[in-house]
Swiss-Prot record:
Binds medium- and long-chain acyl-CoA esters with very high affinity. Can interact in vitro with arachidonyl-CoA, barely with oleoyl-CoA, but not with palmitoyl-CoA. Confers tolerance and binds to lead ions Pb(2+), probably by promoting lead translocation from roots to shoots. May function as an intracellular carrier of acyl-CoA esters. Modulates negatively sterol synthesis during embryogenesis and gametophytes development via interactions with SMO1-1 and SMO1-2; sterols serve as lipid modulators for gene expression of homeodomain-leucine zipper IV transcription factors. One of its GO terms (biological process) is response to lead ion. It comes from the Eukaryota. An acyl-CoA binds at residues 126-130, 152, 171. Induction: In roots by lead. It comes from Arabidopsis thaliana. This is Acyl-CoA-binding domain-containing protein 1. It is a single-pass membrane protein. It is found in: Cell membrane; Secreted, Cell wall; Endoplasmic reticulum membrane. The gene is ACBP1.
Length: 338
């Protein structure tokens, strides 16, 4: 009888031990899966941040971030290489330096008295710009008959999966090599308030072997001038045949950019040239949407006086009236009337 009692006791203890061991293994596996999930989520978010960008030239502005046109643009961390000259620089500072460089190149492109830069260097700038603003090339290869488009595609595609931050750094370095004093020249130009803006130092020629590239550069320039608040150069673009409602890759017109950056004088000049105040970007937002979200009351009121529609809805179903959270009396009256 004692033997049976001892055997039963051993079996019970064995079952309890097996249960506890199984429970411990289950807890360890659950912890491992949760940790792996967190790691994957972090990796996905980091990749997303590194691949998001703004696609068009960014103008020189006192603001560190664009409020609407660049609100979804996220930059990854700075390159961690020990020999990187930009190590430790805040992403906003790098963005500002890149914005200044791209604005300089855009301004330079519209000047016919240009310093000639080889096609090879121009293509390098183009490829770096596309990586910095759009990420790795995913576009199909153009036809061999379209020489310029194919050359530009190759310049972009050969950079592979270069991080946007590295592309911005290389772009700035290349512009600095071509014209070491460009930063000083740009600063002097911005500081001359009330004076007529003269040439911005040596400027870069467009790709010379096909006309389409020159037109594309000018269209980029008109958006850059609107962002910078460069009224005279913007008007020169329009006089040279660039449409006042020319759109960038996100469907934004110069008026969108002028409103986004708070340039009332540019907005007035564009409206005088018959700019469409109700033009929509790719997300269905008009310049008035931008003014409302950016809380630029003077610009919003100006647009409304120019017959901007307060009821146009964007892709999310929101009109400027819907988005307006500010206590603007004249806007409240329109809300009440609707």
């Amino acid at each position: 009888m004692a033997d049976w009692y001892q055997l039963a006791q051993s079996i019970i203890f064995g079952l309890i031990f097996a249960y506890l061991l199984a429970k411990l293994i289950s807890i360890l596996l659950a912890f491992k899966d949760e940790n792996l999930s967190l790691t994957r989520n972090h990796t996905t978010q980091s990749e997303y941040e590194n691949l998001r960008k703004v696609e068009t030239l960014t103008g020189i502005s006192g603001e560190t971030d664009s409020l609407i046109a660049e609100q979804g643009s996220l930059r990854g961390d700075e390159d961690e290489s020990d020999d990187d000259d930009w190590e430790g620089v805040e992403s906003t500072e790098l963005d500002e330096a890149f914005s200044a460089a791209t604005a300089f190149v855009a301004a330079a492109a519209s000047d016919r008295l240009s310093q000639k830069v080889s096609n090879e260097l121009q293509l390098q700038l183009y490829g770096l710009y596309k990586i910095a603003t759009e990420g790795p090339c995913t576009a199909p290869q153009p036809s061999a008959l379209k020489m310029t488009a194919r050359a530009k595609w190759q310049a972009w595609q050969k950079l592979g999966a270069m991080p946007p931050e590295e592309a911005m750094e290389k772009y700035i370095d290349l512009v600095t090599q071509l014209y070491p004093a460009w930063v000083e020249g740009g600063s002097k130009r911005r500081n001359r308030s009330g004076e007529a803006a003269g040439p911005m130092g040596p400027v870069f020629s467009s790709l010379v072997y096909e006309e389409e590239s020159d037109n594309e550069l000018k269209i980029d320039a008109i958006h850059a001038f609107a962002r910078e608040g460069e009224v005279e150069n913007l008007l020169k673009c329009i006089e040279n045949g660039i449409p006042v409602n020319a759109r960038d890759s996100e469907g934004r017109t110069p008026l969108h950019w002028a409103i986004d950056r708070g340039h009332l004088n540019v907005a007035e000049a564009l409206v005088d040239k018959n700019a469409d105040v109700n033009a929509k970007d790719n997300e269905g937002q008009t310049s008035l949407h931008y003014a409302v979200v950016c809380e630029r009351e003077a610009l919003a009121e100006f647009l409304v006086k120019q017959k901007a529609d307060t009821t146009i809805k964007d892709e999310d179903g929101n009109s400027p009236l819907d988005l307006c959270e500010s206590e603007w009396s004249w806007m409240r009256e329109k809300k009440d009337s609707n």
